[in-house]
Design a protein with these regions (language model features):
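Extended, small/polar residue-biased N-terminal targeting/export presequences
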Residues: 2-65, 111-115, 119-139, 364-370, ...
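Cleft-lining beta-strand/loop regions that shape enzyme active-site pockets
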Residues: 3-12, 65-69, 73-82, 87-284
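Residue-level signal for tight coil/turn positions that link beta-strands
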Residues: 61, 146-147, 293
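Short acidic, Pro/Gly- and aromatic-enriched capping/linker segments at domain boundaries
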Residues: 283-294
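Conserved functional hotspot residues or short segments at active or partner-binding sites
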Residues: 295, 299-409
Length: 409
């Protein structure tokens, strides 16, 4: 038949893929069809190594939006910022491309060049030339601040994150004896998330017991819960978690778990609000389906979806006058078309600023955390007050079924 001939020569196959992807993206912004190449790319990225520019992107109004550049990659070195809109890749418009197609165009052989056109609020579009490189993501960066504070920066949650974190904590403890170490800063700012199991094991590194996160699907029986195992790697030392509007998904699970258990004080500004679970369904050689199947809930039963995590200590990062036009408003998950609702009768909120200064002397969030840990500044929210009774955190209320989508991305 004509249909069979079309499929065998590839045209029908492409049409079917486009149709499937169109149906999936109409469900919510995070559901999509991954062809074989993009499925392989996704697997490579979760392993923490791939070739490309080093940016986490999403799609908004047909344009590619930067969620966050990854530290020490060609994109971050070229000055790409969170919330930049990529309109052209090598002089070809991205309008009409799927997110996966645009990502595919941005990847390529190590050493090859690419020009991307970027729109920023208050500025004329600019072309930025970048040389592709082998992206090996250091999931955790660490250092000792002034011989008494352990600083842990988690850039994303890939398969190496928890092991990287364990090693970093061991190195800090070896360099700073227990009586000298005053506490830890866990920096999750502009961390776009990643693997659920890694967010659970990272949370577990700071907890002795209790629920870390639960996921709940459309039906109540589709609930799953994950609990901490004994063994706090930081030995109960005070912890301050830093978040901002670029902290999403797995980052929000960690911040929410440590906040609910009063294990850490969360400082910064409201997080992104991506509180949904994506399940990957492999389709053999054809690729895979990525489907949103559940929402995340913190131990106390809070839905993260389209709401985000509110810090215990709200502290805005001052943006220099000359950069204000470049740092546009961040609407977060609630600003994405067709996003899943929170599943609770609560108002949706936009996220907050994603700006983080390059120089630590200008970083009021890190510097305030250091002052709190050293006792040179005080705040009633630090250290967090323990719960009055060691009770099991409340279970999340049964969420309403997701609303039927009325718009598509």
């Amino acid at each position: 038949s004509a249909t069979r001939r079309a499929w065998s020569d590839g045209s029908g196959q492409d049409q079917s893929r486009h149709a499937i992807n169109g149906m999936l993206t109409s469900l919510d912004p995070h559901s999509s069809f991954l062809d074989a190449r993009n499925f392989r790319d996704m697997q490579v990225q979760t392993r923490g190594e791939f070739g490309g520019l080093g940016i986490e992107v999403t799609q908004e109004d047909g344009q590619i939006k930067v969620v966050a550049p990854i530290d020490d990659t060609p994109a971050s070195k070229a000055g790409i910022l969170a919330n930049d809109l990529i309109t052209h890749i090598d002089n070809e418009p991205v309008q009409g491309l799927t997110l996966q197609q645009a990502v595919e165009k941005m990847r390529g052989p190590v050493g090859s060049g690419i020009v991307i056109r970027v729109n920023r609020t208050g500025q004329n579009p600019q072309d930025i030339r970048i040389t592709r490189d082998r992206i090996v993501i250091r999931a955790v960066r660490s250092r000792i601040e002034g011989e008494d504070i352990g600083y842990l920066r988690v850039t994303q949650f890939n398969e190496q994150t928890t092991e990287n974190l364990r090693r970093a904590i061991e190195e800090i403890r070896a360099k700073a004896p227990g009586d000298q170490l005053k506490g830890y800063i866990l920096d999750l700012r502009n961390n776009p998330g990643g693997l659920l199991d890694q967010s659970i094991s990272v949370s577990d590194a700071f907890l002795e017991r209790g629920e870390i996160v639960s996921t709940r699907g459309r039906n109540a029986e589709e609930t799953q819960r994950w609990n901490a195992r004994a063994g706090d790697l930081t030995q109960g030392k005070p912890v301050i978690v830093l978040i901002n509007g670029g902290s999403a998904s797995a980052s929000e699970i960690v911040a929410g778990a440590l906040q609910d258990h009063r294990r850490a004080t969360v400082l910064g500004t409201r997080s992104f609000g991506k509180g949904s679970v994506q399940t990957i369904i492999p389709l053999g050689s054809q690729g895979a389906l990525r489907l949103t199947t559940a929402r995340y809930y913190t131990p106390s039963g809070r839905s993260i979806q389209a709401r985000g995590i509110d810090p215990d200590i709200v502290l805005e990062q001052p943006v220099p006058e000359e950069l204000r036009a470049r740092v546009s408003e961040n609407r977060g998950e609630a600003g994405l078309r067709g996003h899943l609702n929170s599943g609770q009768q609560q108002e949706e909120r936009s996220a907050s600023s994603v700006y983080v200064p390059r120089e630590q002397k200008d970083d009021v969030q890190i510097n305030t955390a250091l002052e709190l840990l050293r006792g040179t500044k005080t705040d009633p929210k630090f250290p967090p007050q323990p719960r009055r009774a060691e009770a099991t955190p409340a279970s999340p209320a049964t969420p309403a079924a997701p609303a039927a989508p009325t718009t598509r991305q």
